[in-house]
Curated annotation (Swiss-Prot):
Belongs to the bacterial ribosomal protein bL35 family. GO terms for cellular component: cytosolic large ribosomal subunit. The lineage of its organism: Bacteria, Pseudomonadati, Pseudomonadota, Betaproteobacteria, Burkholderiales. This is Large ribosomal subunit protein bL35. Residues 1-15 have a biased composition (Basic residues). PANTHER family: 54S RIBOSOMAL PROTEIN BL35M (PTHR33343), LARGE RIBOSOMAL SUBUNIT PROTEIN BL35M (PTHR33343:SF1). One of its GO terms (molecular function) is structural constituent of ribosome. One of its GO terms (biological process) is translation. Residues 45-54 have a biased composition (Basic and acidic residues). The gene is rpmI. Keywords: Ribonucleoprotein, Ribosomal protein. Residues 1-26, 38-65 are annotated as: Disordered. It comes from the Bacteria. InterPro entries: Ribosomal_bL35, Ribosomal_bL35-like, Ribosomal_bL35_CS, Ribosomal_bL35_sf. Pfam families: Ribosomal_L35p.
Length: 65
């Protein structure tokens, strides 16, 4: 049986943590930033974990992560 392929778009957006969770970047931080407050932009920095409702589908896209 051939090896499963990793979805390359998912591998660029998500990284697996040692504990089994998957981290992702924040949304709403690319453009139209002038109307957002400094506090709002500050809270959008960094990464978050993928929500448990989406975790199964993200893991299916990255079988070897």
């Amino acid at each position: 049986m051939p090896k499963m392929k990793t979805k390359k778009s998912a591998s660029k957006r998500f990284t697996a943590r040692p504990g089994g969770t998957i981290k992702r970047g924040q949304a709403f931080k690319r453009h139209i930033l002038t109307k957002k407050t400094t506090k709002n932009k500050r809270h959008l920095r960094g990464t978050e974990g993928v929500h448990e409702t989406n975790l199964k589908s993200v893991r299916a896209m990255m079988p070897y992560a």
